[in-house]
Amino acid sequence: FESGCHASVCSGGGNMVFYCGPKGGAKSSTHDNRYELMLYRSPTGAQGWTRSQLLYDLAAGYPDMTLLGDRRLAIVFEAGPEKGFITRSSRPAGWMRLDVLILPREVADYGYWFE
């Protein structure tokens, strides 16, 4: 997991736990290392993370998750159109936006994953 950036943890019911945050990578001279938003799943109460899925491959940060009333997993996060967020103080319009992903309720089923 990328250290130093806010991430989110959410119960999927029973022992199912989800963790969502940027995988991160190398910084550049113009962009930070917050990119590749990942979802990790643990069916053992966060004792081990058995599944992972790339949700968004560009700039991503500050995700928050919740389990909706119909058991779908909702994730809201900051997103950008490049590999990492722009680090300079003067940023162009549209450099960042909020995105929402709604994942199917099956994501919390022990036998299901994205494959």
Spans of model-derived segments:
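Asp-box/BNR beta-propeller blade signature and adjacent active/binding-site loops
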Residues: 1-115
